[in-house]
């Protein structure tokens, strides 16, 4: 029973990783896989420039 749960959990994590990578590849199909994520293609990426501009505006 313990082995079955471990195998199912591992398969679930593998599927999550596979579909997550597929979604990122579909968002930016011409991206270089070695270069890392493209912030323009990844809607969940942190936009540091916007945060810096907001902080600058807020602080004066």
Swiss-Prot record:
Claim: Transmembrane is one of the keywords in the record: no
Molecular functions per Gene Ontology: toxin activity
Location of the protein in the cell: Secreted; Target cell membrane
Propiece residue ranges: 28-45
UniProt keywords, alphabetically: Amidation, Antibiotic, Antimicrobial, G-protein coupled receptor impairing toxin, Immunity, Innate immunity, Membrane, Repeat, Secreted, Signal, Target cell membrane, Target membrane, Toxin
Source domain of life: Eukaryota
Protein family: Belongs to the MCD family. Mastoparan subfamily.
Name recorded for this polypeptide: Mastoparan-D
Organism: Vespa ducalis
